[in-house]
Amino acid sequence: MKICDVCGLPEELCVCEEIAREVQTLKVYTVRRRFGKVMTIIEGIDEHDIDIKELTKILKARCACGGTAKKGQIELQGDHKKKVKEVLADMGFSSDTIEIR
């Protein structure tokens, strides 16, 4: 049985990730890239508390698009601002702390 380094509880009972999701302020915005392609950027994710690769995988599947995790931010191909907010809220992030620009 593994013990969480942060809270000291067994990993099955650990609540560190849920607490981190409620506290973080996320920014979701779009930018134009090469050849006029639109990318949705999600930044403000603390990589130490949340598995950013797993979050990217879930967002790509729910938004039906390609994407990647780079430099502490998630990049999704296309304009998915509204869908990303819905998915993040379903995953436990507070909708009040998700800022859409």
From Swiss-Prot:
Protein biosynthesis among keywords: yes
Keyword Protein biosynthesis among UniProt keywords: yes
UniProt xrefs under CDD domains: YciH_like
Signal peptide stretch: none
Alphabetized UniProt keyword annotations: Protein biosynthesis, Translation regulation
GO BP terms in the entry: formation of translation preinitiation complex; regulation of translation; translation reinitiation
Coiled-coil stretches noted in the UniProt entry, renumbered to this chain: none
Pfam family, one: SUI1
SUPFAM superfamilies for this protein: eIF1-like
HAMAP family xref list: SUI1 (MF_00604)
Protein family according to the UniProt entry: Belongs to the SUI1 family.
Name the UniProt record assigns to this protein: Protein translation factor SUI1 homolog
Native species: Methanothermobacter thermautotrophicus (strain ATCC 29096 / DSM 1053 / JCM 10044 / NBRC 100330 / Delta H)
High-level lineage: Archaea, Methanobacteriati, Methanobacteriota, Methanomada group, Methanobacteria
